[in-house]
Amino acid sequence: MSNRMWGGRFASGPAEIMEEINASIGFDKRLAPQDIRGSLAHVAMLGKTGILPQADVAAIEAGLKTVQAEIESGAFTFQRALEDIHMNVESRLTELVGPAAGRLHTARSRNDQVATDMRLWVRDTLDALDAQAADLQRALAALALAHSGTVMPGFTHLQSAQPVTFGHHLLAYVEMLGRDRGRFRDARARLNECPLGAAALAGTSFPIDRHATAAALGFDRPTANSLDSVADRDFALEALAAAAIAAVHLSRFAEEIVVWTSAQFGFVRLSDRYTTGSSIMPQKRNPDAAELVRAKAGRVIGALAGLLIVMKGLPLAYSKDMQEDKEGTFDALQTLSLCLAAMTGMVRDLEPVPEVLKAAAGAGYATATDLADWLVRELGLPFRDAHHVTGRLVGRASARGVGLEALSLAEMREEEPRITEAVYAVLGVENSVASRTSYGGTAPANVRAQAERWLAALGDTQ
């Protein structure tokens, strides 16, 4: 079918390449549920305000529901010649109900229509991402609770720094995901205004009720400026920014899983369900799910950068450039959804290896800070002096290839004569983590309390 919905001004149809570059139905057909929801709300408002007779309203509503059923069943045929989801739906509606279908577009433009569709889709997707992030938080918090006392090395510069607990490490990601969910909700709150009724850019002379349409679609209010209504894609940018930050968090954890599962670390085991083998090396168990989560963060970040570049030079109000908002937004948010699901599955199957974690926690002089703190607390040394004393003791131990706990009291007293036998109590990794009782610290009691608080707040459905 040729496109004649806007063809009155034109003597001939578009070139084939124009049709190809112009069409968006290949990707915006996923907006069908939102497009039909918007049309149903719009036609109901047109009827209530007396703009359309009820007979036309009833016919259009019935036709839209038939179109929806056809799309859901797979019986609907999408046509590239009709450009986009709006025209595909309207064309089929015309076949079903005749001339009444042409009245659906009264007091509406594709400009406000697509802006409404996109806001509805992004809103639905943010809600789903929020729920998925909560699922991952539950999985992490449950594992953190089970390993609140499992000692592991804490790193800076990927070098052993201080002992922490495995549960404490996991709760760091629970906190990150909490901020991610806050950004999803913030983005949702700001996008929850309805552009429908702004028409092409200037509003309409028909006596429409935009507040009624907004309420019917679950928006808080209609948008206040018709130009901004159709020119704005901040809602997509903000959703993509929130998604990009969340993807970075998942990527960081994925990187740690890749490192931790390596033979060189052996901190954790991934289940067979989230690993793959090698076509040539029979011993391999590759952490492909984690590697793909790490890689896919780039797609999400790229979508944000891409849409920023599209929007940066556009004058008000609508330009066809804005059609490029869809593919990147769809792909990025659905990619994040996939990554959240994969990470949740990996965490639920993740098996820490406590004996390996503990052994690694004691390596690299990880209790050196505990020794410095002991010198301050017990001997009254200024911290900078304690730092230097400890550094010299680490140098002695390193030269001998032993841990701090292997130094004799006599050796320690050569650096600080007042050191006593009591110092050895702080050199064990369990004592180190147990001493970190400050709010937010890694002491097992703290970790248990924080994990329990999170599980209670999230509703533990493990």
UniProtKB/Swiss-Prot annotation:
Reaction catalyzed: 2-(N(omega)-L-arginino)succinate = fumarate + L-arginine
EC number: 4.3.2.1
UniProt GO MF annotations: argininosuccinate lyase activity
Biological or metabolic pathway of the protein: Amino-acid biosynthesis; L-arginine biosynthesis; L-arginine from L-ornithine and carbamoyl phosphate: step 3/3
Keywords noted in UniProt: Amino-acid biosynthesis, Arginine biosynthesis, Cytoplasm, Lyase
One GO BP: L-arginine biosynthetic process
Major localization class: cytoplasm
Keyword Lyase set for record: yes
Record's subcellular location: Cytoplasm
GO cellular component: cytosol
UniProt similarity note: Belongs to the lyase 1 family. Argininosuccinate lyase subfamily.
Official protein name in the record: Argininosuccinate lyase
Organism: Methylobacterium sp. (strain 4-46)
